[in-house]
Amino acid sequence: MNTSLIEITVAEIKELADVEPKQASKRFELIATTMNDEQLVEVIEKMDIVTLTQINSHHDISCPSIMSELMTPEQIRDIVCQQPLYWEEKIKNNAEELIQHTFDFLTYLIRIQDSEEKQTAILECIAEDPAGLFYLSIPFIEMMLGEGHDDEDHINDYYDDEEDTDTIGYDSRVASEEAHSFSLDDPRSLMALIHELAPDVEKAIKNLLRNESSGWETIINKFVNELVIQAKEKNQVTDEYAEVDDMFSFLD
């Protein structure tokens, strides 16, 4: 497939994503049957982050996603950090909905990958971004800080670290077992996977939550506000760079 056809495909998907993101997702999956991975990667690379976010946010997460499998950890991180701008009000204003939504989206993006190496790279890449770490933490806030989970044993389970890497009595063997024993719709399954693949990310999540003293719903609202603010700031910087590029486009 030549460059012009790649660009036509990108334009078609983008135009559809602007009005019917779910249909754009289905269209991409259909087009994927006519291209090889190298061509699909080129299509993805030419899409802007807004289009990628819209498509992935509206993909049926019960079905495999070729796009998510082919995206780089950096692209997935950018989608995660951008997605809060597109949350519906019924999600954004409901703490329990947010927990479920962020958990489902992270599970979909991470577990669809075909190797533990890429899963690890995605987790580490997301956690390196302050907004990404906020997003990663949301599915576990009620589990770690909610009422009924504040007894001493529970606090030790989540916060008592040995050398700030492993929870007491929670070695890698147990983590591996737990990663496969919880049902995939249980947030503990994702936390067990993070513990197994990216212990530094688990540590970062725990440190972030350790510094919070408010109720879990208040903390979620705070994190959501931070996510939206940071996403808008990133968009502003991106727009400014785009304006500069346009100013000097005549030199190309």
UniProtKB/Swiss-Prot annotation:
The organism's place on the tree of life at top rank: Bacteria
Alphabetized UniProt keyword annotations: Stress response
Null allele phenotype: Deletion of the gene leads to a dramatically reduced growth at low temperature.
Induction field: Part of the atcJABC operon. The operon is constitutively expressed, and expression shows only a very slight increase at low temperature.
General function of this protein: Involved in cold adaptation. Directly interacts with the RNA polymerase and decreases its activity. May direct the DnaK chaperone to the RNA polymerase to sustain life at low temperatures. Overproduction prevents bacterial growth due to RNA polymerase inhibition.
Quaternary structure (record): Interacts with AtcC, but not with AtcA and AtcJ. Interacts with the RNA polymerase subunits RpoB and RpoC.
Annotated protein name in UniProt: Adaptation to cold protein B
Species this protein is from: Shewanella oneidensis (strain ATCC 700550 / JCM 31522 / CIP 106686 / LMG 19005 / NCIMB 14063 / MR-1)
